[in-house]
Design a protein with these regions (language model features):
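N-terminal low-complexity, intrinsically disordered "leader/linker" segments enriched in small/polar
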Residues: 2-51, 70, 74-76, 207, ...
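Extended recognition patches within non-cytosolic domains
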Residues: 32-35, 50-54, 191-243
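Extracellular glycan-recognition modules
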Residues: 53-121, 197-203, 241-258
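Extracellular structured ligand-interaction cores
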Residues: 79-83, 136-138, 145, 169, ...
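Short, aromatic/His-centered strand-loop micro-motif at the edge of beta-sheets
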Residues: 118-138
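Localized edge beta-strand/strand-to-loop motifs within extracellular or lumenal beta-rich domains
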Residues: 132-151, 196-198
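Flexible glycan-contacting loops in extracellular carbohydrate-active proteins
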Residues: 157-189
Length: 258
């Protein structure tokens, strides 16, 4: 009996500690330099090294403001899985497109939406599954074929697996409908984006900056491909900040007005 392969975790062990992309304040202490990171994914004493070409530098995230987006070269099908680490900066006023592609609203769909302040929607084949949760905030989204988990509870799904193929490549920060891009693009930050064909990791995309010109985007360490914005403006990227050991970086601070 074949065992299900271990997928690469969203929490990494580094040589001197741990890196969780949701709270990665210590990661800079474990980098060898701006383009080399030593990690392992199953908490053993064997470490892999993620090495970027010297022309790129690791970023904590890239941020979109409803204009930039990424056009991948991956066409989703019924066995596609995405594991994405995303912070949603605002509650969507109406149907903010997050990632995916489809033939039409109800045909050959593999897409994810931020519908409003309390609803995500995950579409698969011909099914649309609403997910009730506060949408502003930081989430691990695991859209695995016909089911969807969010940090990490099962919160949406369809009746079963379907054999289908989208006619167009998947996009990130928007949705590709048979070649037409949704105008209501994501306002938020992407920390990592992994694409699987069932259990095979096809793309492992991490935020980087091109040192020569400052352009930010996602770098796929599988195919060694850089994906900058395909939109009219570039992404904004945040570099890692090295803090003293007695401080941690917060997502935000809030005032009560008193």
């Amino acid at each position: 009996m074949n065992q299900k392969p271990k997928e690469i975790s969203q929490i990494y062990r580094l040589e001197n500690g741990f890196w969780n992309p949701i709270n990665n304040s210590s990661v800079v202490l474990n980098k060898i330099n701006d383009n080399i990171l030593k990690v392992n994914n199953n908490f053993t004493n064997i470490f892999d090294t993620i090495v970027l070409p010297e022309e790129y530098q690791f970023l904590e995230y890239i941020m979109g403001n409803s204009v930039p987006y990424i056009m991948t070269d991956v066409i989703p099908n019924g066995n596609t899985k995405v594991i994405a680490n995303i912070y949603f900066d605002a509650a969507s006023p109406s149907n903010m497109a997050v990632f995916g592609s489809r033939q039409s609203n109800s045909s050959n769909t593999f897409v994810f939406w931020q519908i409003n302040s309390s609803t995500f929607r995950s579409d698969y084949a011909t099914t649309q599954a609403s997910i009730s949760v506060t949408t502003k905030g930081h989430y691990n989204i695991r859209k695995e074929m016909n089911t969807t988990h969010i940090s990490p509870t099962l919160v949406g799904g369809s009746s079963g697996l379907v054999n289908f193929t989208s006619p167009v490549p998947m996009t990130i920060f928007t949705i590709n409908t048979n070649g037409t891009l949704a105008s209501n693009k994501l306002v938020g930050r992407v920390y990592s984006f992994d694409i699987y064909d069932k259990y095979t990791l096809m793309r492992k995309m991490i935020p980087v900056k091109k040192v020569s010109n400052g352009i930010c985007g996602l770098y796929d360490i599988i195919t060694k491909t850089f994906y900058p914005s395909s939109g009219a403006v570039n992404f904004i990227g945040k570099e890692f900040i090295s803090l003293p050991s007695d401080y941690i970086e917060l997502e935000s601070i809030t005032s009560t007005g008193t």
